[in-house]
């Protein structure tokens, strides 16, 4: 996924009300940008962090700039929660995720479960349907260890239960964690942030839900889905 125009560098002043970020650009210009991330963004809100913004010329937008990347712990972190689904859609079209390659079609936002919409439904005439949920990961508290979630994630826990129900019916069910960081080489659930999610992930992984974790290649011009990363469901990735 290429950014539509070169990103603009600045420094974060503050992030507030979840969706707003005050930034000072490298040329000294202060501005308020849209922050496309409703989560806690632990470790990514620190004033003074270098950040990268995209700019839109759409006159209907209230804020022309969007916070896209933050430099933290020596690496780049993608904070836009819309990107993982776009990255996965791009990778599916290219057959770049071997574990779910070979399906004739994929549809997005298909209703299932308890009034939910699955991110992707993969279909082919010669194999069971594949229900695929995508989760964005940007938390790192120990060197190299990506964690999810960074706050209580009741909706994500419900998605795991719904995937397990699809697996019980004989379909494939997959949860794909997309790690939008360049400094992580493994993944574990953050049990201290949400013990129910961590327990549910371990449970559904034993009940037929496939767990995939992929890293990302990130720079100021583009984001690409990277290589698969190892994972475990121990939830022991808490800081000492």
UniProtKB/Swiss-Prot annotation:
This is Sugar fermentation stimulation protein homolog. It holds the Pfam family SfsA. One of its GO terms (molecular function) is DNA binding. Belongs to the SfsA family. NCBIfam families: sfsA. It comes from Phenylobacterium zucineum (strain HLK1). Signal peptide: none annotated.
């Amino acid at each position: 996924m290429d950014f539509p125009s070169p990103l603009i560098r600045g420094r974060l002043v503050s992030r507030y009300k979840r969706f707003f970020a005050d930034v000072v650009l490298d040329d000294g210009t202060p501005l308020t940008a849209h922050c496309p991330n409703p989560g806690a963004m632990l470790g990514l809100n620190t004033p003074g962090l270098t950040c990268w913004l995209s700019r839109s010329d759409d006159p209907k937008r209230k804020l022309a700039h969007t916070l896209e990347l933050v430099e933290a712990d020596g690496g780049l972190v993608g904070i836009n929660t819309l990107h993982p689904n776009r990255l996965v859609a791009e990778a599916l079209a290219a057959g770049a995720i071997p574990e779910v390659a070979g399906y004739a079609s994929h549809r997005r936002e298909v209703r299932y479960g308890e009034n939910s919409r699955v991110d992707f439904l993969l279909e082919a005439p010669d194999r069971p349907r594949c229900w695929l949920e995508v989760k964005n990961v940007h938390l790192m508290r120990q060197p190299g260890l990506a964690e999810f979630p960074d706050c209580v994630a009741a909706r994500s826990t419900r998605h795991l239960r719904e995937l397990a129900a699809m697996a019980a019916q004989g379909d494939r069910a997959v949860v794909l964690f997309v790690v939008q960081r360049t400094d992580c080489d493994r993944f574990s659930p953050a049990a201290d942030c949400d013990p129910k999610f961590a327990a549910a992930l371990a449970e559904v992984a034993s009940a037929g839900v496939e767990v995939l974790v992929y890293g990302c290649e990130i720079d100021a011009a583009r984001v690409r889905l990277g290589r698969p990363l190892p994972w475990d469901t121990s939830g022991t990735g808490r800081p000492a």
